[in-house]
Each structure stands twice: as C-alpha cells, then as structure tokens.
C-alpha cells in the first residue's frame, strides 16, 4: 500500500508541514510546493545553474525551468 504522500500512485495529495498549494510538484492532482516534506512530492526536473523548476513541471517529460534557464 503506497504512503499517503505518494500522490502519483494514490492521486491524493497530503502535503507535509510548510507546504503550500502554489506549484504542482507531484502529479496533476497535487499541489505541494518544492519544499514539501513528503517523499512522494518530489519530481526529477533539473534546471541549469541555480534556476528552479517552473510551476507547470510535474516530471521530466514536461520540465519547465524559469525564464532564461534550460532543462537537463
């Protein structure tokens, strides 16, 4: 049985302490912020330098980095 934070499997998002609903971080139905403490709320999206992944990034297939940055 997957954990409550494994949103990709359960499609139910329970964000950890300090998480906001600003950006989607763990699947289309989930709105955990990048600092979410839940293990299932992490996505692999590598942007160049110190640039962060954009709000539309839900995984490697649709990685969107901040303006002026490139995705690896």
Curated annotation (Swiss-Prot):
Taxonomic superkingdom: Eukaryota
The UniProt record lists the keyword Metal-binding: yes
Assembly notes: Homodimer.
Taxonomic lineage: Eukaryota, Metazoa, Spiralia, Lophotrochozoa, Mollusca
Keyword check for Thylakoid: no
Binding annotation for Cd(2+) 5: 47, 51, 53, 57
InterPro entries: Metalthion_mollusc (IPR001008)
Binding site for Cd(2+) 4: 45, 57, 63, 71
Amino acids binding Cd(2+) 6: 53, 65, 69, 71
Annotated residues for binding of Cd(2+) 2: 19, 24, 38, 41
Organism: Mytilus edulis (Blue mussel)
Binding site residues for Cd(2+) 1: 15, 19, 32, 36
Name of the featured protein: Metallothionein 20-II
Induction section of the entry: By cadmium.
The family this protein is said to belong to: Belongs to the metallothionein superfamily. Type 2 family.
Keywords tagged on the record: Cadmium, Metal-binding, Metal-thiolate cluster
Annotated Cd(2+) 3 binding sites: 26, 30, 32, 41
Listed GO MF terms: metal ion binding
Function: The metallothioneins are involved in the cellular sequestration of toxic metal ions.
